């Protein structure tokens, strides 16, 4: 976000939309999609890699059985 706002401010002062502005705009959108996917996985308990499951309470299960009694 820091780099995005820095580039955005420089472009505004210059008065033109250059290649860097478009690149950081796309990068910002890509990060938003990534964080949306990760948040959805955290809420719904979707396995995200190699059998690991992250639950909505933040506990990460790695295939072993946890007994909470």
What kind of region is each of these model predictions?
Residues 1-10:
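A short beta-strand micro-motif
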Residues 4-5, 26, 68:
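Generic detector of N-terminal low-structure segments
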Residues 13-16, 21-50:
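A short, charged, amphipathic alpha-helix used as a generic interaction element across diverse proteins
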Residues 38-69:
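Short, mixed-charge low-complexity intrinsically disordered segments
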């Amino acid at each position: 976000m820091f780099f995005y706002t820095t580039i955005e401010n420089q472009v505004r002062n210059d008065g033109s939309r250059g290649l860097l502005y478009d690149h950081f705009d796309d990068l910002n959108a890509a990060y938003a999609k990534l964080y949306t996917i990760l948040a959805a996985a955290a809420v719904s308990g979707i396995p995200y890699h190699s059998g690991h499951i992250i639950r909505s309470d933040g506990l990460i299960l790695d295939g072993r059985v946890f007994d909470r009694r």
